[in-house]
């Protein structure tokens, strides 16, 4: 039997919230890469030791800021209304996921880029990536019986990498990115039969 995780002390919870609010404010105002952990600690009114013990480094702080946003999208996928949530055909759910994830990606692009590039291969070790991949693989297996759904899920997630989208947005706007990703999703779910 697993024990419940230890409860967070009230002062630790207050400090965590202060740090996250300070980081979100500074990141919005100056961009994630321009803000130091020292600046976050000063803005939050906590010591650097508190910040580093709690989050480790900037990528850990970014991951904490993304956590609630990722959980929200995951909940909408698992139990929200169709077509993103259950109850729609698999192909429609794939298209809805690509649209919802593109919106999420564009809104939190700087945070996602830092999280996904914290170390080589970091994107693929993030629990959220594994969730997105598994979700798409299940839907693609249903939409394209006989196709290599596992690989196709990776292929569909590849152009959704934050670093890639950052580079593409230098050349075109978010609407064009979203339209192109929709075409890719359509091709995967409506393409020729596997074989």
Where are the language model's segments positioned?
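Short linear capping/connector segments at secondary-structure termini
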Residues: 78-82, 113-122
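Alpha-helical DNA-contacting segments of helix-turn-helix folds
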Residues: 62-69, 108, 112
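Amphipathic C-terminal alpha-helical segment
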Residues: 104-107, 111, 138, 142, ...
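Basic, helix-initiating cap at the start of DNA-binding domains
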Residues: 1-30, 34-43, 60-63
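Short hydrophobic/aromatic patch on the recognition helix
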Residues: 45-55
């Amino acid at each position: 039997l697993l024990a419940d995780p230890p409860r967070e002390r009230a002062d630790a919870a207050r400090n965590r919230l202060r740090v996250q609010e300070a980081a979100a404010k500074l990141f919005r105002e100056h961009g994630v890469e321009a803000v130091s952990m020292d600046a976050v600690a000063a803005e939050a009114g906590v010591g650097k030791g508190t910040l580093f013990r709690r989050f480790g480094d900037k990528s850990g702080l970014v991951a904490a800021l993304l956590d609630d946003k990722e959980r929200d999208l995951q909940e909408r996928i698992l139990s929200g209304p169709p077509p993103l949530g259950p109850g729609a055909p698999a192909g429609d759910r794939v298209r809805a996921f690509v649209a919802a994830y593109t919106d999420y990606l564009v809104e939190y692009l700087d945070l996602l880029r830092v999280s996904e590039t914290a170390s080589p291969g970091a994107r693929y070790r993030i629990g959220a990536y594994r969730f997105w991949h598994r979700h798409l693989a299940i839907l693609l297996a249903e939409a394209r019986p006989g196709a290599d759904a596992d690989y196709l899920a990776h292929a569909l997630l590849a152009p959704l990498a934050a670093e890639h989208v950052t580079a593409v947005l230098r050349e075109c706007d978010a609407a064009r990115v979203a339209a192109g990703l929709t075409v890719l999703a359509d091709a995967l779910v409506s393409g020729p039969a596997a074989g």
